[in-house]
Amino acid sequence: MHKVQLIIKLLLQLGIIIVITYIGTEIQKIFHLPLAGSIVGLFLFYLLLQFKIVPLTWVEDGANFLLKTMVFFFIPSVVGIMDVASEITLNYILFFAVIIIGTCIVALSSGYIAEKMSVKHKQRKGIDAYE
């Protein structure tokens, strides 16, 4: 495929993911659920994939792109906290340790789950999962 076609394919797949997340946000608003809209969207996305309403091939490259660039999504929250550092009256070392540990736990658990799902998917397709 040409680079332009790959970029368009990636953008369309990211668009599907964004639309599903947006629908989850709207569901959360309509039903006043006690969960974040993005979490509702993630659960909706999971159900759509499990019941094969949305085939994995429609979003696989876009999801892999997001997984590869996931670390960049954690940077704004850390920078945002640094902007309000003067308002934080806690012990700074403890506060930043909790932030760093929490970020690492989220990143590691997300990566672990994604890896397990990838291995399971490859095994279903009959591909050597640990190539």
UniProtKB/Swiss-Prot annotation:
Query: GO cellular component terms?
Result: plasma membrane
Family annotation (InterPro entries): Holin-like_CidA, LrgA/CidA
Give the residue spans that cross the bilayer: 4-24, 30-50, 65-85, 88-108
GO terms in the biological process aspect are:
cytolysis; killing of cells of another organism; programmed cell death
Asked if the record carries the keyword Transmembrane, the reply is: yes
Q: Does the keyword Membrane apply?
A: yes
Topology in membrane: Multi-pass membrane protein
What does the UniProt entry say about where the protein is found? Cell membrane
Phylogenetic lineage? Bacteria, Bacillati, Bacillota, Bacilli, Bacillales
Q: Which organism is it from?
A: Staphylococcus aureus (strain MRSA252)
Q: Which UniProt keywords apply?
A: Cell membrane, Cytolysis, Membrane, Transmembrane, Transmembrane helix
Q: What is this protein called?
A: Holin-like protein CidA
**Primary location:** membrane
Explain the purpose of this protein: Increases the activity of extracellular murein hydrolases possibly by mediating their export via hole formation. Inhibited by the antiholin-like proteins LrgAB. In an unstressed cell, the LrgAB products probably inhibit the function of the CidAB proteins. When a cell is stressed by the addition of antibiotics or by other factors in the environment, the CidAB proteins possibly oligomerize within the bacterial cell membrane, creating lesions that disrupt the proton motive force, which in turn results in loss of cell viability.
Q: Signal peptide position in this chain?
A: none
